[in-house]
């Protein structure tokens, strides 16, 4: 075997191994209610209700839950007159609850009619979502699209032009397919569909600008349900324009499949600097928690280093050295405790969302990983001494023993948060120094 000298030559110095995303794709900033989207603003998390919008109380309850979970914009379906009539009442009730999250109206087929006949709805919404595939058909398309854009201009509202391959503009797709068939070098039909997605969004945006809607009032999206197609479409959309971009994998699915697919697609695009606002479109279990899509979106952004929302708890996966479940239970309990307390902590302890906690299960990686965290514990693995060293700011602080290790560590975490983020000395003072 050939020896390889991996040491840097003194005269050259050590070569830096770069980490981090590419620079953000530069887009025109759009204001949606009280939220800035694009133009270098933090990537915005949004979500969508699944209630009947005409059911005012149920919709208010779910919007409030999504907002409190961290959704910074919430989209609601406006599909009929009863829903349009309910929108201003939903806005009013949310305001009384102190929930100022911007509401986005999701319109299909008859959006022009609902917005014109219910001006209070048009005024209460912060943004209108238009689907260029079903805003109108044949000779009615331009008229109905123009009507929505003019209402947006009148009310000083933003618009998302959201193409979706499940409802793609069939006239555009047919024309592109026919042009491709006549080409001496035809491309794959799926590639034509991707091109149609990009053109649908961009041609609609161009038309909106011609009507008078400026770029700083437009956000574009082009959603598909296949990860590779989604990546390709958004890369092209970003390459051809500087409109603010809404990312999302449509019909991602249920459970782990939906989470993994969305994380893979959005993670790649975000790493390439593409995306100004994201939504994770999960299919919830019957009666499931709708706020899961918000938590997943936040975790994607936080694990990639784009934003911080809640303190992170790092925990090892466990192996044959960790037959005890103590570290798993402690990691779960600490994360649950943090999530429960975060609404109050955000105001009481500014910056606490940047806290890193480690709960490790044995001596192999436990001490090292705990040192990387702000506060960490290395619990004993199988056959190891029943003692758990705690590390604070990279230094061994003390060793916990006995049946109360979990409770003692939780108390240390609370003390650390209070003193680091509450203005007191950074090191816990209610416990003794390292033993």
Curated annotation (Swiss-Prot):
GO biological process, one term: isopentenyl diphosphate biosynthetic process, methylerythritol 4-phosphate pathway
Binding site for [4Fe-4S] cluster: 316, 319, 362, 369
Pathway: Isoprenoid biosynthesis; isopentenyl diphosphate biosynthesis via DXP pathway; isopentenyl diphosphate from 1-deoxy-D-xylulose 5-phosphate: step 5/6
InterPro entries associated with the record: Dihydropteroate_synth-like_sf, IspG_bac, IspG_bac-typ, NO2/SO3_Rdtase_4Fe4S_sf
Gene Ontology MF, one: 4-hydroxy-3-methylbut-2-en-1-yl diphosphate synthase activity (ferredoxin)
Comp. bias (Basic and acidic residues): 1-15
Obligatory cofactor(s): [4Fe-4S] cluster
EC numbers on record: 1.17.7.3
Cofactor detail note: Binds 1 [4Fe-4S] cluster.
Start and end residues of each stretch annotated as Disordered: 1-24
Highest taxon in the source lineage: Bacteria
Catalytic activity entry: (2E)-4-hydroxy-3-methylbut-2-enyl diphosphate + oxidized [flavodoxin] + H2O + 2 H(+) = 2-C-methyl-D-erythritol 2,4-cyclic diphosphate + reduced [flavodoxin]
Gene3D superfamilies reported for this sequence: Dihydropteroate synthase-like (3.20.20.20), Sulfite Reductase Hemoprotein, domain 1 (3.30.413.10)
Enzyme class: oxidoreductase
Annotated keywords: 4Fe-4S, Iron, Iron-sulfur, Isoprene biosynthesis, Metal-binding, Oxidoreductase
NCBIfam families attached to this UniProt entry: ispG_gcpE, PRK00366.1
Its job: Converts 2C-methyl-D-erythritol 2,4-cyclodiphosphate (ME-2,4cPP) into 1-hydroxy-2-methyl-2-(E)-butenyl 4-diphosphate.
Family of the protein in this entry: Belongs to the IspG family.
Name of this chain's protein: 4-hydroxy-3-methylbut-2-en-1-yl diphosphate synthase (flavodoxin)
Organism in which the protein naturally occurs: Afipia carboxidovorans (strain ATCC 49405 / DSM 1227 / KCTC 32145 / OM5) (Oligotropha carboxidovorans)
């Amino acid at each position: 075997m050939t020896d390889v000298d991996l040491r840097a030559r003194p005269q050259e110095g050590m070569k830096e191994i770069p980490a981090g995303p590419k620079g953000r794709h530069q887009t025109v900033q759009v204001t949606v209610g009280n939220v800035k989207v694009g133009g270098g603003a933090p990537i915005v998390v949004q979500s969508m209700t699944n209630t009947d919008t005409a059911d005012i109380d149920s919709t208010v309850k779910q919007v409030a839950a999504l907002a409190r979970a961290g959704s910074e914009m919430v989209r609601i379906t406006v599909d009929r007159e009863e829903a349009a009539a309910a929108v201003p009442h939903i806005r009013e009730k949310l305001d009384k609850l102190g929930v100022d999250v911007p509401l986005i109206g999701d319109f299909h087929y008859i959006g022009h009619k609902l917005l014109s006949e219910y001006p209070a709805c048009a005024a209460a919404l912060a943004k209108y979502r238009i689907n260029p595939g079903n805003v109108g058909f044949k000779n009615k398309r331009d008229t109905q699209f123009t009507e929505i854009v003019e209402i947006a201009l009148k009310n000083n509202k933003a618009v998302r032009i959201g193409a979706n391959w499940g409802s793609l503009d069939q006239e555009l797709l047919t024309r592109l397919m026919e042009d491709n068939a006549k080409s001496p070098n035809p491309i794959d039909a799926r590639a034509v569909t991707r091109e149609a997605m990009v053109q649908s969004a961009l041609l609609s945006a161009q038309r909106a600008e011609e009507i008078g809607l400026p770029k700083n009032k437009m956000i574009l999206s082009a959603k598909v349900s296949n990860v590779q197609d989604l990546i390709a479409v958004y890369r092209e959309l970003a390459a051809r324009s500087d409109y603010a971009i809404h990312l999302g994998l449509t019909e991602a699915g249920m459970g782990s499949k939906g989470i993994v697919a969305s994380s893979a697609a959005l993670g790649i695009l975000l790493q390439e600097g593409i995306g100004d606002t994201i939504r994770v479109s999960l299919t919830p279990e019957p009666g499931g928690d709708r706020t899961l899509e918000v938590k997943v979106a936040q975790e994607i952004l936080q694990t990639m280093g784009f934003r911080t929302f809640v303190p992170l708890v790092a925990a090892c996966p466990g192996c044959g050295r960790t037959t005890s479940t103590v570290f798993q239970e402690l990691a779960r309990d600490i994360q649950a405790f943090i999530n429960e307390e975060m609404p109050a902590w955000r105001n009481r302890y500014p910056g606490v969302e940047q806290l890193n906690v480690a709960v490790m299960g044995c001596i192999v990686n436990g001490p090292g990983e705990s040192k990387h965290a702000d506060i960490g514990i290395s619990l004993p693995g199988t056959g190891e001494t029943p003692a758990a060293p705690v590390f604070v700011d990279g230094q061994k602080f003390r060793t916990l023993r006995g049946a109360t290790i979990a409770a003692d560590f939780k108390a240390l975490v609370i003390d650390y948060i209070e003193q680091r983020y509450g203005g007191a000395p950074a090191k816990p003072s209610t416990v003794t120094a390292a033993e």
